[in-house]
Amino acid sequence: VKILIEVPADGPLFEGHFPGRPILPGIAELVLLGRALPDPWGAANVSAIPFVRFRGLVLPSDRLEVSVESRGEDGIRFEVRRGAELVANGAMTFGAPRVEDGGATAVASRAPRSVPPIPELIPHRPPMLFVTRVVGVADDGATCIARVPGDCALVAGGSAPAFVALEAAAQTAAVWEALRRSPSSGSAEARVGYLVSLKDVVLHRGTIPADTDLIASVRLAAHAAPLATYAVDVTVEGELALRGTIGTYLSG
């Protein structure tokens, strides 16, 4: 299957990510792909994401050519190209959400002290600013409350694909990194970071409601600056929404 995605020159997909430096969020790239896939594939039917690698920034007015290969019950493999340049590739499986495995949710339990306002910690702005507050910190991670705003372009009909909660996890990781920098610099500093990879993401529901609290927890699994890998999970309405691993790149 071949799919052409015309990235708009501006508009809701770029609002808040990042002001003055518009970049299509990696998760938005997956939402656009999911919306373009034929049935029975589709963003709300994703049950797992074995891997995704975001290899290049997607900018306003980009023209993306997507090649999709069916793997039967194993879902799809896909490549996203801008001309000859590979900008993303990955795999998705589809079907009923996976049954929760019963693993404990990794919540950072130490109460944070003197946390600056979230907009001082990360460069995101509404409607792409999901994290609302920090509820716990640890030496290797953090737990934040987040919400997907109803006016976010990733929302349709009051809900978003469940994997959009990975953006809340990525922002939680960015908040923790900013807090970790503050003891050495004297103040927290908002720096642009990028979501560069997903691995072994298992989804326990098809969608998440907008304007509803999410609890996103991240724990550092590996670090080789400027790259970092985090084990993440997100719960909503008292139930696990997803669990997996993300990779981030901190610029500057």
Task: Say what each PLM segment does.
Residues 40, 115-125, 187-190:
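Short aromatic-glycine motifs in intrinsically disordered, low-complexity regions
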